[in-house]
């Protein structure tokens, strides 16, 4: 399977950790966005939205990291532990995935990206949205070792990619004890943590 990615990208890292958990070897293809490689005709044929990560499995192409994660588990998982078939368990996992995409990671992008890529000043109102997102995550994790129940799922891997990116941005987790405890545990149990952290350090270079 071909996997178009950037090591520093949190969505790409979440897929890499999922593949590691499944024992899948991906044929990694580094895409240089600054050089416009994602806009070349050959890549646009694969993904007209020209985004990363993008997975090509035979004649099937898929993008959006959380969709890729679920696809890999459903097609290649020897068990359903990362994305259980139980409708209620799966619904909670989906909620966490959508929360990561639409609230937590979005708060990172909205606050930090203008500072990194447009040299804009920090917006305190957008920082409040980060704090709100972490308040929610802290509540979700109350009484739970993992993000969507009592075992590791794709929700944890997606959230881990995001939260670790906040760490290299020097965000202080100390006000969120449940998040801090979960994060410390995930660093030890998540497959592919080392590669994820190496990617975080790549991304950290943007902060100067």
Swiss-Prot record:
Catalytic activities: RX + glutathione = an S-substituted glutathione + a halide anion + H(+)
Sequence ranges assigned to domain GST N-terminal in this UniProt record: 1-80
Enzyme class (EC, first level): transferase
Biological process per Gene Ontology, one example term: glutathione metabolic process
Taxonomic classification: Eukaryota, Metazoa, Ecdysozoa, Arthropoda, Hexapoda
Protein name as it appears in the record: Glutathione S-transferase 1
InterPro entries linked to this entry: Glutathione-S-Trfase_C-like, Glutathione-S-Trfase_C_sf, Glutathione_S-Trfase, Glutathione_S-Trfase_N, GST_C, Thioredoxin-like_sf
Function: Conjugation of reduced glutathione to a wide number of exogenous and endogenous hydrophobic electrophiles.
The protein's Enzyme Commission number: 2.5.1.18
Organism of this sequence: Musca domestica
Gene it is expressed from: Gst1
Binding site for glutathione: 9, 50-52, 64-66
Family: Belongs to the GST superfamily. Theta family.
Residue ranges of domain GST C-terminal in the record: 86-207
Classification via Pfam families: GST_C (PF00043), GST_N (PF02798)
Keywords, ordered alphabetically: Transferase
Subunit structure: Homodimer.
GO molecular function ontology, one term from the record: glutathione transferase activity
Domain of life per record: Eukaryota
